[in-house]
Amino acid sequence: MSAAKEQLLAAQETQMTLIEKDSTDLKDHIDSWGPVRREHGLLYAARHKGLIWLGLNPVPPCSVKCLEARQAIEMQLLGNSLKESPWCNEPWSLCDLSWGRYQAPPAETLKKGARLVEVEYDGSSTNKTWYTAWNSLYLRKPDEEGWETATGGADADGLFYTTMSGTRVYYELFERDAARYSTTGTWTVRDNDRTYHSHSAPSHSRETIEGLWNSGGRERGRPTNSPDRAVLHTPPGGNTVHGPVRACENRGRSINRPTPYSTPQSPRSGVGPDTTSPLPSPVPQNPRCVSLPDGFGRGEEDNPPSPDQHDVIPNPQPKEPRFSLFGSSGGLPCLLISGTGNQVKCYSFRVKRWHRDKYHHCTTTWWAVGEQGSERPGDATVIVTFKDQSQRSMFLQQVPLPPGMSAHGVTMTVDF
């Protein structure tokens, strides 16, 4: 299995090099999926032979590696196909050709230029949610080889993209979420500097929403001059793609969603009732609840202080001592652990997780600075510090060093 370990290490090292390159060239991202596929294939073969570890890497079940290997193959073939299209020379980031973005709504499309679309229900500033819209989308042509581009947008109905032929395809409908989280069936959409208001309150008794479907799982859109009827998008698996995750699905309780940015608390003109105005309260039935003049029949015991009236001061946490390589007057015992970038990063992760009590501090992975660009001459290195010589000796005895790595003991002293 030594050959398999070397091949796995080489595949992981190639992946790290391409990730740190931060390239915008499509060819580099196509090449990055090759070592990913080899890594999953090696781990699949290792698990098939009954191994649960391959070097320092745990071996997942065969079903997991088989699925991830197929995903890598699909993305590599997708990139090779895109390389033959007119958009091959555009700047492409590693995220643009990632599996997660490829499967994000609308599924099985490449996307660029994400932006947030805010939807406010019932005119309430506390009843909001956000969706992700895309400026540009790239789709495989269903009936012929090749690619076509589309522009993303949003309106009062939902999120959509418009193809080169003028067909508008909706992949997210706000009406469905309004039926669950809105009491009046109205909402306001804000997309950058554009604002849209919902149409008349939808009928929630309708069981289905009309749509056009084809056998490939991708919906057929409608021309832009056709009547407003949204097309519901369903991925090939059959499960309807929902919008963002919501923290509460009970409309009887207040809905507080985390905001991706700070919003002013001033009232806005929106559709629906004004939720900021207080509602008239019923006449209390308990005589103790009747408002009395100040100083009449009230004592200090009747009005206990509210927690909101006092500042909560947390107990101060003791500050950890600041890390320094030269903190010890007699010299700080250290170890210089060197190897390839992947080896050193895996090693530092492992000792931090399983042997944290056996050393004092550990630095991040570092290299020497090259003469040009992002060149990194020499091996990757981490510095592990210890409180005294005995702790370092015990660390060397109890923590094994993987093959191919080296450890050098040094003592940090200050000359001036």
UniProtKB/Swiss-Prot annotation:
Location of the region described as Disordered in the Swiss-Prot/TrEMBL record: 190-321
Superkingdom of origin organism: Viruses
Chain segments carrying region Transactivation domain: 1-203
Keywords: Activator, DNA replication, DNA-binding, Early protein, Host nucleus, Phosphoprotein, Repressor, Transcription, Transcription regulation
Modified how: Phosphorylated.
Gene Ontology, cellular component aspect: host cell nucleus
Biased composition (Polar residues): 256-278
Stretches the record annotates as DNA-binding domain: 333-416
GO biological process: DNA replication; DNA-templated transcription; regulation of DNA replication; viral DNA genome replication
Single annotated GO MF: nucleotide binding
Cellular compartment(s): Host nucleus
Function field: Plays a role in the initiation of viral DNA replication. A dimer of E2 interacts with a dimer of E1 in order to improve specificity of E1 DNA binding activity. Once the complex recognizes and binds DNA at specific sites, the E2 dimer is removed from DNA. E2 also regulates viral transcription through binding to the E2RE response element (5'-ACCNNNNNNGGT-3') present in multiple copies in the regulatory regions of the viral genome. Activates or represses transcription depending on E2RE's position with regards to proximal promoter elements including the TATA-box.
Quaternary structure note: Binds DNA as homodimer. Interacts with protein E1; this interaction greatly increases E1 DNA-binding activity. Interacts with protein L1; this interaction enhances E2-dependent replication and transcription activation. Interacts with protein L2; this interaction inhibits E2 transcriptional activity but not DNA replication function E2. Interacts with protein E7; this interaction inhibits E7 oncogenic activity. Interacts with host TAF1; this interaction modulates E2-dependent transcriptional regulation. Interacts with host BRD4; this interaction mediates E2 transcriptional activation function.
Family: Belongs to the papillomaviridae E2 protein family.
Stated name of the protein: Regulatory protein E2
UniProt source species: Odocoileus virginianus papillomavirus 1
Gene this chain is encoded by: E2
